[in-house]
From Swiss-Prot:
Quaternary structure and interacting proteins, as annotated: Part of the 50S ribosomal subunit.
Alphabetical list of InterPro entries matching this protein: Rib_uL2_dom2 (IPR014722), Ribosomal_uL24 (IPR003256), Ribosomal_uL24_KOW (IPR041988), Translation_prot_SH3-like_sf (IPR008991)
One Pfam short name: ribosomal_L24
Organism expressing this protein natively: Nitrosomonas eutropha (strain DSM 101675 / C91 / Nm57)
Example GO molecular function: structural constituent of ribosome
Protein name (record): Large ribosomal subunit protein uL24
PANTHER family recorded: MITOCHONDRIAL RIBOSOMAL PROTEIN L24
Recorded family membership: Belongs to the universal ribosomal protein uL24 family.
Length: 107
């Protein structure tokens, strides 16, 4: 499988939408192009009570997925969004790096 530029657990910044400029981490991938980011794109959802499953009804806030093109990986050294490239390290493994300064993301 091809290596992805953004992975689960990466520190990202939101590029567009109502949460533009927020920094957070990727929680999970919903599909190939949709990502759930912690505390971003939160919406209120109405939940019906279900006593057999011990679910209390009411209004809850959940995180909805956003498109992967609306986020960018965050470079903490430069304190801004950055692009990701791929290269092979000395042992022959493929690793990600920041294109602006060449520092490795995967150590």
């Amino acid at each position: 499988m091809a290596m992805k530029k953004i992975r689960k657990g990466d520190n990202v910044i939101i590029l567009s939408g109502k949460d533009k400029g927020k920094q957070s981490t990727v929680i999970k991938f919903e599909s190939v192009e949709k990502v759930i980011v912690r505390d971003v794109n939160r919406v209120k959802s109405h939940v019906k009570p279900n006593p057999s499953k011990n679910i209390v009804g009411g209004i809850v806030e959940i995180e909805k997925p956003i498109h992967v093109s609306n986020i960018a990986i965050f470079n903490s050294d430069k304190n801004k969004a950055d692009r990701v490239g791929f290269r092979f390290n000395e042992s022959g493994n493929k690793v990600r790096y920041f294109k602006s300064d060449g520092t490795l993301i995967d150590l």
